[in-house]
Every structure is written in structure tokens, then in C-alpha cells.
């Protein structure tokens, strides 16, 4: 049995810089890993039981589950294949812009790469991961990164240690709906990591205005956090966050928050790093 932590992320900013011929959007962003985790337990089955089961999450269609799809992709490379039960203890809210599903898929690839003796390196695992989602590779490499392309072109960066307050509004945001809006900014000027470092407060999220206008719960959460610092949207939402500063009374802010809240710390590397260095 192997039990591991599968971390979340926030986007410190997110700009859409263009649209490709295949319909995918080009973006620039910074992925920051945080210490909010799902816990995943991998338990091998007996030789007679070669199937895969997943418990702990509600999933009507297993074929659409990212954990199952990650395992199916890696199964082709297995030298010591065995059936598995994968149990997940969810702490990362789903559909919130925190990358929980992508992180779970990456964790599955990393753990099963060793358990099944697949022998793939990180670049090979990331190439599989991007088939599941553009932000899966960040969790494969387990480092904070400046992201470009559709999110898969990564330049690893050193970021200062921070603490954040995250609010999870009680709504589910449709990414498809946001992308379909004509008012979505799709031509932000390309920028650099150095420019971000000089004035991070100038860098926002192109989805924020739409999320605030279409979802009153997001507007309420952002107005609340804006009283104490600069509120930002992560991903396409619904979660919003602000950086903790010395003058903040964190416990009071959390106590009076209009929705579920989390206090998290930034990570410099994933807790799965031992699965990465051993490959």
C-alpha cells in the first residue's frame, strides 16, 4: 500500500494572449503549488484481480475519470502490471481552479510508473499527462513554473514563500461558458517573468471580470477579500485568493468569510518529489 499527498495549485495570474488554429487558447500564467492536498492510497490487488477500482469520489462514468484515464495510459508501458484499488480522500474542492483533478492524474502517473516498473522519465510522463489536461505536467514536475502555450510549456521559477487565504464560493463555474463569451479578453500583450516580479499587482486574470458578472457568489467572495488585500481568481474559478500580509488578522478574516475558506502556504516543490528523483 502506498499513501501519498496530491497537491493543489493557484494561478498567480492568467492572461490569454491569442488563439491557435485548432481552437485552443494561448496563455501565460504562473503556477504556484500550495499545501492543500488530496490523499491518495494505492493498494495492489492479487494476481487474480487485474482490474482497477477507484473509491472515495462520486463518478458516474469511470471512463471520464482522470485517475482512471491516467492509469489506462500508463498500463501500456507496465512491466509488472497488477490490479489496483485507488482510494482518494478529497480535500481540494472540485471544479474550483485549484487543479485537483489534474494533480490526481499526475500523482497516478508518478506512483504507477514505479509500482508497475514502467521506467518512464519525467518528460515522458509529462507527454502522457498533457493528453489528459494542459496543467497535468506542472504536477508531474512538481515545481513552480512560468507557463506558456496552452499551459504545457513550462519554465521553472523560484518564488518567495507566501501564505494565502482562499475562498471557495458556493457555485460551479462552467469553463466552456466563460470561453464562449464574446467579451472575454483573448489578446493580452505577452509579458515576462521579470515584469511580473517588478509589479505583480498589475497582473490579473482575464476570466475574473466574467466570473464576477456571471456568478454573484464569486463577486461576493472577491468583494470580501478586496477589503483586506488584492483578491484574485485562480484558473477559471470558482476559488479566489489573496496573499496574507503582516497586518491581516487571518483568523478573523476566515471567521467572517461568506463561504468556505482555506489558509494555505506556498510550496517550492511537490511532496511527491521522491517519486521524481528516483526515476
From Swiss-Prot:
GO terms for molecular function: 4-(cytidine 5'-diphospho)-2-C-methyl-D-erythritol kinase activity; ATP binding. Belongs to the GHMP kinase family. IspE subfamily. It catalyses: 4-CDP-2-C-methyl-D-erythritol + ATP = 4-CDP-2-C-methyl-D-erythritol 2-phosphate + ADP + H(+). Keywords: ATP-binding, Isoprene biosynthesis, Kinase, Nucleotide-binding, Transferase. It holds the Pfam family GHMP_kinases_C. ATP binds at residues 93-103. Disulfide bonds: none annotated. Catalyzes the phosphorylation of the position 2 hydroxy group of 4-diphosphocytidyl-2C-methyl-D-erythritol. The active site is at 9, 135. Its EC number is 2.7.1.148. This is 4-diphosphocytidyl-2-C-methyl-D-erythritol kinase. The gene is ispE. Pathway: Isoprenoid biosynthesis; isopentenyl diphosphate biosynthesis via DXP pathway; isopentenyl diphosphate from 1-deoxy-D-xylulose 5-phosphate: step 3/6. It comes from Acinetobacter baylyi (strain ATCC 33305 / BD413 / ADP1). GO terms for biological process: isopentenyl diphosphate biosynthetic process, methylerythritol 4-phosphate pathway; terpenoid biosynthetic process.
